């Protein structure tokens, strides 16, 4: 989409120019929905051109067990269509951030920042007085402490309404996983799921995202933290699925349910190097080098959170009508509320997976304020969905 230089914050325009100049782009394409993709040689992302080896393909697949009484269909991706233009062999897709909708009111920091993970687990042991304490965030999640080396699960996909009744365009609604480590003075986190976020994605549809921070959400920058491949850190591997890709179709209230699988795995290759690999729909999408974390999350996970996050930009966040999941509360259940199912934690470096057995937690945008969102847990259910829950709220 064309960018209006009069409307845009000059700081944002300069940042994007610098980012683009740092990529070794050999071809640029546009998807049917209008996303701009820059294709770069896969080895250009790596010092010395050394490309990491992914885990075995069979380990990319999450538990696909289904209940025949609750049929679910997978979402699709635009690059699944062989007719969609791609880059040449040996290149991988890097999404170009769409800043065309952003006005001069939106600063570079506002565009880049994601701080909700700083408060999603208020009981963490390494909390610091100087930690970010962002306003406007609501969470309803499944929380589990322990020592872990990965996670997988399946997320239902919806198109929640945001920026209602009068958000400033920076609101978001997310279903995701947080993998956090507390060994360092600053919280470290690797995250992923799907998000509806107009300022990040340029539209109001669900997109896959990844995020990481090595410094407790205090600064997003190259090799420090950030969404997708907005900053350096993420290494793209797949030629068809990438952070920021649009997904669809979404679930229909009372009708066809759609979902997507994700997997995070701390993997040590034969060379001894360790990386955080991320798979989507059974495809190894890419990874975060574990050395970004200087120990800490590069060794193990201390806490796994799975659930929903809503951010409202309103001065009184409790007045928001932003939706989480389907927009319906957890008690509405099958075909009405969003779910996350077949939730499993990796408990050793040998890829052993066990059912998640967390507890329900929530926090609100203002201490003592109302919580319009709910979660209903069914851990180790004994059924085809294993450990699962329904989550959401702010009915349509």
Put a short name on every predicted segment.
Residues 1-396:
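Exposed, interaction-prone regions of secreted/extracellular proteins
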